[in-house]
Amino acid sequence: MTNEAIIQLKDIDVTFHNKGQTVTAVKNVSLTVNRGDIYGVVGYSGAGKSTLVRVINRLQQPTAGTVEVNGQDILGLPSKELRVARTKIGMIFQHFNLMASRTIADNVGYPLKGGTLTREERQKKVAHLLELVGLTEKATDYPAQLSGGQKQRVAIARALANDPEILISDEATSALDPKTTSSILELLKRLNQELGLTVVLITHEMEAVKEICNKVAVMDAGEIIERGDLVTIFSQPHEKLTQDFINTATQINQALTKIYKQAQTLGLDDHQQLVQLQYVGASTDAPLITELYKRFEVVSNILYGNVEILQDTPLGNLIVVMTGAPDKLAAAWQYCQSAGITVTHLQPTDPEVA
């Protein structure tokens, strides 16, 4: 990862006209992706994320705005130069689009046809690409003989045939089971590290973003509503939609649902509070529960606990029932906040979370 911008989208609008109606799919979006990033763009269906990334290689012509890739004005390129520029931007999709009548090796080598490589050089390159994605032994097989995950690996190898600097993954894991999804994401991360490949990951699953991305942008109704580095977004989200995505990815939603269903059995009184504690980095190593009791005689009953490792940074979540005198509870809150811990008072009757 560097601070050198490889993709710069500025003030992008994409508007469609159909039967007298105007639909704005992307509205005034600016986005910078640096070389070596794995940049996640997350949003629900219809948020505009796929339309936005298709602007990068001009598969979608924007209504307004500018697009620079590797310092080139993509929107100003004539057809011939645009075709050359597109060879440096690979794409993979939810559907693999493999040719059923061709072998795996032929599918991977197809983008090389008509190029400058000799037949022997093409064969050598295809063998290398298949080795990269772990499918050397499948070279002579046909797509029908492969699993979904293997087919996506073939699609990745094919997308790398022209040595792209950028790989756009547009919902490429959406049709795969969780285990296969994880293996594909690990492959993308390895390619990013070994080849210096810049990856733009389009997804509706924050879990995928959490696995491999270093930066993330959240889209809603054609706009980017929040963006930043992964740890900051997960530890300090500002928008409710972002928090919803994070809660789903960290399993907090499931924990809260169970806790709220049992809220009546908790029997909270004036000396008790249901609290979520979120802490990042070195704070995760501190013996927090012990300190709260030693300093303030506040007893914390842990209902849920989880620690995620994001970009080598620990991010912890606890849901606890704090018990103590009201003034001691207030002092315990202040202590947590001064230690860099985010404290949220949870209301079991809150319909937003229940």
Curated annotation (Swiss-Prot):
What sequence ranges are listed for the domain ABC transporter?
A: 9-246
Gene Ontology cellular component terms for the protein in this record:
plasma membrane
Q: Where in the cell is it found?
A: Cell membrane
Report the coiled-coil segments.
none
Listed binding positions for ATP are G43, Y44, S45, G46, A47, G48, K49, S50
Q: Which UniProt keywords apply?
A: Amino-acid transport, ATP-binding, Cell membrane, Membrane, Nucleotide-binding, Translocase, Transport
Its assembly, as annotated, is: The complex is composed of two ATP-binding proteins (MetN), two transmembrane proteins (MetI) and a solute-binding protein (MetQ).
Top-rank taxon, per record: Bacteria
Q: What is this protein called?
A: Methionine import ATP-binding protein MetN
Instruction: State the function annotated in the UniProt record.
Output: Part of the ABC transporter complex MetNIQ involved in methionine import. Responsible for energy coupling to the transport system.
Task: Give one GO molecular function term.
Answer: ABC-type D-methionine transporter activity
User: So what does this thing catalyse?
Assistant: L-methionine(out) + ATP + H2O = L-methionine(in) + ADP + phosphate + H(+); D-methionine(out) + ATP + H2O = D-methionine(in) + ADP + phosphate + H(+)
Question: What InterPro entries does the record point to?
Answer: AAA+_ATPase, ABC_transporter-like_ATP-bd, ABC_transporter-like_CS, ACT-like_dom_sf, MetN_ABC, MetN_ABC_transporter-like, NIL_domain, P-loop_NTPase
Which family is it part of?
Belongs to the ABC transporter superfamily. Methionine importer (TC 3.A.1.24) family.
Q: Fetch the Pfam families from UniProt.
A: ABC_tran (PF00005), NIL (PF09383)
Tell whether Membrane is among the UniProt keywords.
yes
Stated EC number for the protein is: 7.4.2.11
The organism's lineage is:
Bacteria, Bacillati, Bacillota, Bacilli, Lactobacillales
Membrane topology according to the record: Peripheral membrane protein
